[in-house]
Amino acid sequence: MSNLKNTLRNNRWACWLALACLVVPMFASYFFDDMFSSLSELFKNPQTLELGWNMADYGFYSSGYSFLCIWGGLIVCGALLDKFGVRLVGSIFVGMMVFGAALVTFAISAGFEPSVSLTVAYVGCMLFGLGSEIAGVSVTRSIAKWFKGRNMALAMGLQLAIARFGTATAILVAPMIVRQKALGEIYTLSETNRPALIGLAVLAVGAILWAVFVAMDKKFDKQAGTTDKVETAEEDKFRFSDIWKVLSNPRFLMIAVLCVTFYCCVIRFKKFGVSILLPLFGVDLDIATLLLAMIPFFTILFTPLFGALVDKVGKATLWMIVGSALVLASHLIITFAPQGVPAYAYISIAMLGVGYSLVPSAMWPSVPKIIPEKNLGTAYSLVYWIQNMGMWAVPIYVGHIFAREITETGNHAQEISAALHAEYVFILLGVVAIAVALMLFFSSRRNPQLKLDQPAS
C-alpha cells in the first residue's frame, strides 16, 4: 500500500511539478510567435531597418507559422503521436520548435540581404510553427494523462492562461527592449533581434524542462505499468473515408468557417494592431502596446467564466452570435469612429477581448455534439487545418496592403489609408463569421436532437 501511495500518479505535488515543466515551453512558444506584434510599426519604414523588411515581408514571415500545418503536418504528426507516444514524438517537435526559432534568430541577426534573411526566417518560422502546434498537442495529452480524475479542467485552464500570458508578455516587453527612435534613425540588427534572443533563451529553458518532464513521465508509466502510446480498437482506427464523413456534415463546415474567420479577426489583427491603432486614434506607442496586450489578458480572465456560463445555461449558438457580433462591432468602431479619440480604441479592444473569450467557450464544446466520438480526432484536425489556411493567407494580404499604401516615411495620410484598408479585410471576415454563426443558430433550431443549445448534463 505504501508503494502505491508513493507513485507519481498519487503524488499531487509531482503532478503540479509536471505541469510546471509543461507550461514553460508553451509560454515560450506564444512569446516567440508574438515577439514582433507590437513592433509592426517598424516595418512601415524598411529604409530605417538594417534588417530591410517591409510590411509585406513581415506579413509573409508571419504566415510561415501555418504553412506546414496546411500541408498535412498536423494530421500526419497527430497520427505519429498516437503511434509512437508523447515522449518520443513530443521531444522531436519540441526540438523542432527550438531549432526553428534558432533559425529565425540567426536569419535576422546574420546581416544577410533582406531577401535571403526573409527566406531563411520563413523556413525557420515554418519549422517553429509545426513544432509549436504538435508540442501543444503533446502538452494537452500529457496534462490529460497526469491529471485524470483530479483537477484536469483547472490544469488545462492554467496551461492555456500561462501560454496566453506569453503573448501578453511579448507584446509588452518588445517595445521596452527595442526602444522607439526619432523618425529616420536606423534600427540595427543587434536591436531588432533582441526579442528573438530572449524568446530563444526562454524556449531553451522550456526544452530543458520538457526533458525533465519526459524523465518523470517515463517513471510514471513504469510505476503504473502503462504506456504513452494510444491503443486504438480496430473499428476506431483512422480511415481516409472519415475525412469525407466529417466534411460532408454541414454543421461541421459552419463551425470550421466560423473558426477560421473569427480567429483571423483577432489573432491576425494582433500582428498589425499597433500599426492600425497608432494612426487612427493618435495614441503613443506605449498606449497602443497596452491596448494590444489587453486582448490576451481578457481571455485569461473571461474564457473560464464564459465556459462555465455555457455549461450552466446552454444557448451555445446564441453566444457564438453574440461573440461574433462583438468582434465585428469592434472592427467597425476602429474603422468608423472619429479619428484621434483614444477612448474609442479602449472600447473597441475591450469588445474584441470579450468576444474573443466568448466564441471559443461556446464553439469548441459544440464539436462533440455534431461529430461521432470515433471521428472527433479527425474533426478537430480538420478544423485546425482549415483555420491555418486563413492564418497563412490573411497576414500575407494585409502585409501587402501596408506595403502598397505607405510609400513615404512619416506620411500620416498614407498610414491612415493603410490602416483603414486593412480593417476592411477584418470587417469582411467578421461579417462572414456572424453570418455563419446565424446559420448555425437556425440549423440548431431545426435539429433540436443535436442538443447544441442545451446546458451540460
What are the functions of these language-model segments?
Residues 316-363:
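C-terminal transmembrane helical hairpin of 12-TM major facilitator-type secondary transporters
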Residues 2-11, 220-255, 457:
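Juxtamembrane intracellular "pre-TM" segments in multi-pass secondary transporters
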Residues 153-179, 384-395:
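Glycine-rich segments within core transmembrane alpha-helices of 12-TM secondary carriers
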Residues 95-114, 325-339:
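C-terminal ends and interior cores of transmembrane alpha-helices
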